[in-house]
Amino acid sequence: MKKIRVICVDDSALVRGLMTEIINSHPDMEVVATAPDPLVARELIKQHNPDVLTLDVEMPRMDGLDFLEKLMRLRPMPVVMVSSLTERGGEITMRALELGAIDFVTKPRLGIRDGLLDYSELIADKIRAASRARLRGPAPVAAAALPARLRSPLNSSEKLVILGASTGGTEAIREVLLPLPPDSPAILITQHMPAGFTRSFAQRLDTLCAVTVREATHGERVLPGHVYLAPGGEQHMKLGRSGANYVIELEAGEPVNRHRPSVDVLFHSAAQAAGRNAIGVLLTGMGKDGAAGLLAMKRAGAYTLAQDEASCVVFGMPREAILLGAADEVVPLPAMSERILMRAGDRGHRV
């Protein structure tokens, strides 16, 4: 079996050693070299031609972002960022994903060694996903490069969009939200992310989009023109009802499909609370989280969309949904916003 060849770039010798130990403990991958900074890494990449690079976000001698930007321009390859759990770390990580990094893993703040060893399976999963990922170019940043804003059909506040994503999802979500007008239907999103990063992600999207994007809070009313992002790591997000209103419910619970928040938990709750007033959307991601939930939504009368293989970074979750017969339609990412708004224009049903 051909192993996934990995180079680890981190200024901490401790982290380099731990990453090597973790990666080499999995039979399908190996560390072929490590580097303390991007300048050393540049030579090692030429020498070893790795399948995946793990890259520390904040490093001396050359900033991780500068290096990533040059790498994606000159020699694109799958990169998994290793990030500290700080606000600055969160902002830098969001920018790294925009520049083309496939995914990221957090560095635990305390007891680095124990934390990283606990993360062994997660790190291995992310490296496997990265090795199979379809590379994207950097996201456009100039205002001129932003897509034309779509016009909203007449909406009822009963209609809402329920969306799930994982690997590659941050940029896919950005692409879906950017063209939406300010009077779009409410959107609830579960994107697999650790605690501490969803706030940075929501703030980043809020500055770019016409809709209001924020991290969801328990008990808040769901309003049109708003996007609610499930907080990372600690709780599941559900859609509930309070009288005639939809509300956000955040609740503790065991991980589902190894994820918390889980897309399936959100989708199953939407099937129950919104029925045919919901539009279910499943975007790029590894694994099967969301597939069964999308089927439940479809059976409850929702219209369901899955991202097509050609536009996915990792065609895992949408593929599982399609195999289950859970998707009414398979849609390329660039057409997704328009399809959502077209379906949202259908009349809402009072529940």
From Swiss-Prot:
Its EC number is 3.1.1.61, 3.5.1.44. It is an enzyme of class 3 (hydrolase). Transmembrane segments: none annotated. One of its GO terms (biological process) is chemotaxis. Residues 5-122 form the Response regulatory domain. It catalyses: [protein]-L-glutamate 5-O-methyl ester + H2O = L-glutamyl-[protein] + methanol + H(+); L-glutaminyl-[protein] + H2O = L-glutamyl-[protein] + NH4(+). It is found in: Cytoplasm. CDD domains: CheB_Rec (cd16432), REC_CheB-like (cd17541). InterPro entries: CheB-like, CheB_C, CheY-like_superfamily, Sig_transdc_resp-reg_Me-estase, Sig_transdc_resp-reg_receiver. GO terms for cellular component: cytoplasm. Keywords: Chemotaxis, Cytoplasm, Hydrolase, Phosphoprotein. Coiled coil: none annotated. Residues 154-341 form the CheB-type methylesterase domain. Involved in chemotaxis. Part of a chemotaxis signal transduction system that modulates chemotaxis in response to various stimuli. Catalyzes the demethylation of specific methylglutamate residues introduced into the chemoreceptors (methyl-accepting chemotaxis proteins or MCP) by CheR. Also mediates the irreversible deamidation of specific glutamine residues to glutamic acid. Belongs to the CheB family. This is Protein-glutamate methylesterase/protein-glutamine glutaminase 2. It comes from Bordetella avium (strain 197N).
